[in-house]
Amino acid sequence: MNIEYTSEQKQFRVDVREWLKTHAPKKRLPSLDTQEGFDLHREWERTLAKDKWGNVNWPVEYGGRGLDLISWLIFEEEYYRADAPLRVSQNGIFLLAPTIMEYGTQAQKARFLPPMASGDDIWAQAWSEPDAGSDMAAIRTKAVRDGDHYVVTGQKTWSSRAVFADWCFALVRTEEGSERHKGLSKILIPLDSEGLTRRPIAQLDGDPGFAELFFDEVRVPVENLLGPEHGGWGVAMATAGFERGLLLRSPARFQAAAARLVKLYKEHKDRLSSGVGEQVIQAWMNTERFCAATYQLVSRVQAGASISSESSANKLFWSEMDRHLHRTAMTIMGAQAELEDGLDAIDNGRWLDGYMFSLAGPIYAGTNEIQRNILAERVLGLPRK
């Protein structure tokens, strides 16, 4: 892959690298799924925002630098090369923010985007329900109009970041008697609202990365409706496209992991079979392929093209790629992967954490089975049955 960067983009890369060298934490922060780790990651978001590094492709008036997506990819490459912290604000800045920019009113943009950029408001997702996980159109949580408020009643589950976050974006049913994709609306809800209860859900490592949310007649101002009333399915699909497509998982994240995998292999190759080396090569090649495909896609977007089914293909590729990469690391380490500290620990258990998270990749952001169905129907033209 040969990419010709402009002189401005080359200088931008130097600026990012120098800033991160000075400001990025020297040690890994605690898990953002703990209160301590969440607070420290929020402070890091504020550090990024202070010098407008948190969202370089956002408009200047909302806390960004007004740069293009190629510059964002450059930033991501330097960010992950510096081993900077994961973005606790990702639900907001990568998923909700572009949705607000597309569907929100000017008042909503001015109200929600600046505190999102600054790290003052951290957002959670509130989509899935006990009987509406992958089948999001089966949502039953309802929001009944009462004057200038909606009254929300129902339950959400697997709400990422909801244990410690400030706000959530929720898909609810606003039209009585509606079914499936019709009659849904997307509304923005403060998580400290009266009548809203959070119940943490422990992950494999014991940390509460998700929460159940119970809405008992929670009153939400009508101005928190994002997009058209009863037209929330299209708004939600736009957000899902951002989640599956370009923004949530940049190639740099996986390239950095692949570089660490190569280093890990070199340190242990004397006791490994040649087949493991081939797996490492494949993992590294996959990340480079994903990077090339992403640059190509970004170039098309900047030329005015829209993306649709590419988001599903993207999600399929990065989730399977991540799982293969981390499974290869586990093969190299064997039982040592279980150790988080001590003389025999490798990278403080980081690979094990990454492996457990990679197992969820084919599930969140729409299961890979659903993505394959989308591609089969919309790209290949195959029948639904």
Where are these regions (language model features)?
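Glycine-rich phosphate/pyrophosphate-binding beta-alpha loops
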Residues: A132, T157-A162, L204-D205, A360-T367
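A short core secondary-structure module
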Residues: D148-H149, T153-R199
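Internal helix-loop-helix
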Residues: A49-A110, P114-D120, R161-W167, T287, ...
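Glycine-rich beta->alpha junctions and the first turn(s) of the following alpha-helix
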Residues: I3, S7, L196-A292, G361, ...
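C-terminal helix-coil-helix/basic helical segment that borders enzyme active sites and/or dimer interfaces
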Residues: R28-Q35, K266, D270, S274-G277, ...
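A structural signal for short hydrophobic beta-strand segments in well-ordered beta-sheet cores
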Residues: T141-V144
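Glycine-rich phosphate/cofactor-binding loops in nucleotide/flavin-utilizing enzymes
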Residues: N2, I70, I74-F75, L95, ...
